[in-house]
Amino acid sequence: MHYLIFMDVDGVINSVSFYETVKSITENPLDPEAIKRVKRLVELSEQHSNSVRIILTSSWRYGWNRDPKFRDVGGKIIDTGLAMYGLRIYDKTGVSETRDRPGEVLEYLRKYPYHVDGFVILDDANFFWEKYRLSEWWVKTDAKVDGFKESMIEPALHMLQNPPWWLRLINIGKKKHT
């Protein structure tokens, strides 16, 4: 089994309530408790999958690159913040001219070289996910309080384990991840 977690940053692993506790602009802007909840989702997913990968969909992706030499400060903050909890970004979605996040997720799924058994989208904003038939795999996080909450872990896991029927069509001809 091979799962993808499409993850935003603002409103998922940070929130307004967290920012209110930050005392200095030099402090890490990522909420350790929200990151631990994402870690819990990954751990539960790994019980059913041999591979769980986090794909960055956030505007923070502009500063993140697969090659660490090309990451800016924001990219390094994400890497460091997640690495403290044993997590890492595997990749990022592309950026369309229209900044169409649902379309970017679908394009990523289409171009991804391996068979995907399930995915979930963690995002605080509604980018018209329903228009792309993605709303059933979207966990609406809370940008104001706590981002990705404990109560969202089980629904996210359920979404990973129950992919859309059309994912089979996207997977045709793709190799299984080992």
Where are these predicted regions, by residue range?
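Short catalytic/ligand-binding loop motif for oxyanion handling, primarily in non-cytosolic enzymes
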Residues: 14-16, 62-67, 127-131, 148
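Short His-Asn-centered micro-motif
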Residues: 7, 56-60, 122-124
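Short amphipathic alpha-helical segments
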Residues: 18-19, 49-50, 67-68, 132-134
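C-terminal cap/substrate-recognition subdomain and adjoining C-terminal extension
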Residues: 71-178
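Acidic-and-aromatic substrate-binding clefts and catalytic sites of carbohydrate-active enzymes
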Residues: 32, 62-66, 96-99
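Substrate-recognition element of Asp-dependent hydrolases with the DxDx(T/V) motif
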Residues: 49-74
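Active-site neighborhood of HAD-like aspartate-dependent phosphohydrolases
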Residues: 1-50
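Structural motif
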Residues: 4, 53, 118-120
